[in-house]
Each structure stands twice: as C-alpha cells, then as structure tokens.
C-alpha cells in the first residue's frame, strides 16, 4: 500500500537518500515493474507540486500580491508615451521626465540645484546637513576664501585711496635759481635739515589718509589763516630784508585755495628747531636738495590751482618790474643779464617801486571803455540806442603801424560808435 501524498512529499524533500535507497531494491524484481510505474509517476508529480509551493512559503506570498497588483486598473496614462500609472503623483513625476521640469529647489544658501522629485531633494539636503560631508567643507572653505579676498581687495582700495595725493592740487616745483642770481647764501647745515624734511614729510604719498577729510581741510584753513597773520606781523617788524615777502603775500592772502596751499607748505616744512623762529630760515629749507649752495626758491615755489598771476612766494631777489606780475609784452620787459647781477644784498625798496599802469601793461582793461547796455537803452533818443561796434576791428591800419597812438585810436573809435557812426566813416 503506498504512503499518503503529504508524507511522501515531505519525506522526499527532507530525506532524498532514503527515497533513492527504497527505490533501488525494486529494480531487480521484474514482476514489480508494471505496478511501480504509476507509483513513480505519481511521486514525481507530487514533488513538482511541493517545489512549486515552496517559494510562497519562504517569501511570504509576495508573488501572489504582485499578480494581484498587476491586475489593478491603471487610470493615469502618460499623454506623451504608452505608460500608465495607478496613482496621480506617479504620473506627475513621470511627466516631468519628458518636460524637464524641476520644481524642487534646494533652500540652502548658496546652492542653486533643483530637482524634479522630492525624494531627490531630500537626499541632496543631507549633503548640506551632514557636518562630515566633504562637499560641505569644500563649499565653506571656498566661501571663506572669497570673503577674505573681498575684504583684502576693499582694504587695498582704501589704502590706495588714502595714499593717493589729491589730484586737484598737483605739487610742481620750478627749476632752482643759480648761485649767481641768489644774493643770500645758506648756512652749512641747512641742506641736511632740508633733506631730512624732504624724506619724512614732503613726499605726496607720506600724508595720512585723514587729511583728505572735510574736518582736516577746515583745520588746515584755520591754521593757514592764523599762520598768515602771524607771518605778516613778523615780516612787518623784521626789517628791509623780508619786506618784499610781506608785500607780495599781501595780495594773495585772501584766497582760500592759497590758504590751503600755504597751510600744507608750512605743515610740511615745520619743525621745532630754533631756526624756525626766524621767518627767513623756514623758507631756506624749501630749496631743492640738489642745489645746496642756493637758498633762493624760484618764483613761484609751489603752484596750486590758482588762476591769479600773484604767486604764493616771491624770490628773495625780486626782478626790477612790478610785483603784481601783470602780463607784459616781450618788448616792454628788460631784465638785467646774469653778469650784471651782484652777490650783495639788494636795496630795501628799490625793486619794489610800482610802475605806473600804462595802457600796454594790462590789455583786458581796454575792453571796458564806453557806455554799458543799460545806459544805451535808457537814452530818450531812439537814434542813440545803438550798440557799439565790437572793438576788435576798430583799429585802423595806421594805428597798427604806429603802436604809440593805439590807445587814442581806441578812444576815438569808441566815441564814434557811441555817436552812431559806422565803420566807413572812421576809415
């Protein structure tokens, strides 16, 4: 009698050797071949059924649920391809693969990455939140390096702006006067003193950055005003030697740019040595270092943006012409040659006598003769309300050939224009 199917199945699975030993002695019996064939066929079919039942027992019956899920309806179909999905969010996520849309952006400061799926964004955010991440450490190092470089650039820009001299006040020095033209000889130690001041204070890049502020400019103006008053008072009592310095500075002391230039000049050449008590010694220090035997600074010593012809400082040996330095013609100015100059002290007031203001010394004053526009318009007679002809073409050929009578010809032409005459009558 054959055993039950369940016992045969488990016995064959657990003890395959016993099954083979049981089947071997039945082979030599010839009479049992015919009945053993159906029994062996039945046992093989039972083994196949038991093997097919083993995966559901071992894997928790997962293939059965997958088969059930495959049978569920897929209502959400992709309009761009043939795929269909059970849930709407799966369809939406799939459509983004076609369109390239990435709505999930990283919220970390400095990160510009975007993702089409929220789980990818979550996985990416762990990079920023993980303190041991190499990428995060590298990003922090790059940010710190960029901040340090920006701070260094700002510091260099501030330093450069503080060291740059003000472009509106270029400090130019003219050529030094030779020893023959200077009547005063410097003491032996003035060159070394000036050289030390030149290295320490006179360089345009050696100024401090706070001198460019408005408060320091006001302080410079106030200091310059007090220094001008004190020096003028000192020069007034100093005697004939410095009298021309006072008179030349008296014309330019009321201009604010010159006050600032005067303050900068005095601040750069000021020291607390006994030599500065004299109004002459601090001007000696402004001589150029490559001419130690000459102490007379040329005229003008410092040129700042002042449009006035009067310089800040005049030379110690004043030329024999007007101290106002009006524009003179080349034929009117006759200076003595270098060979005729002496090394002795010049007379006190001899070169300072002002020359009479002739018509040829200052040409712009000639253009203001004649009535003004208000005088012409206020005349009761209508025939006299005529503007004068411009004075440039009024000079006749005879007046140009005879420059001595040019001034009278201008007056006569002006009178004719006021009277109403035209150009043809004058010729």
Curated annotation (Swiss-Prot):
**In what ranges is there compositional bias, type Polar residues?**
405-417
Protein's organism: Aspergillus niger
Modified how:
Ubiquitinated. Deubiquitinated by creB, probably to control its activity or amount.
Similarity-based family: Belongs to the creA/MIG C2H2-type zinc-finger protein family.
Q: Fetch the InterPro entries from UniProt.
A: creA/MIG_C2H2-ZnF, Znf_C2H2_sf, Znf_C2H2_type
Example GO BP = carbon catabolite repression of transcription from RNA polymerase II promoter by glucose
Where this protein primarily resides, as one coarse class?
Answer: nucleus
Report the protein name in the record: DNA-binding protein creA
Q: Please state where this protein is localized.
A: Nucleus
Q: In which residue ranges is the amino acid composition biased (Low complexity)?
A: 15-49, 289-303
Q: Which gene encodes it?
A: creA
Gene Ontology CC terms, in alphabetical order: cytoplasm; nucleus
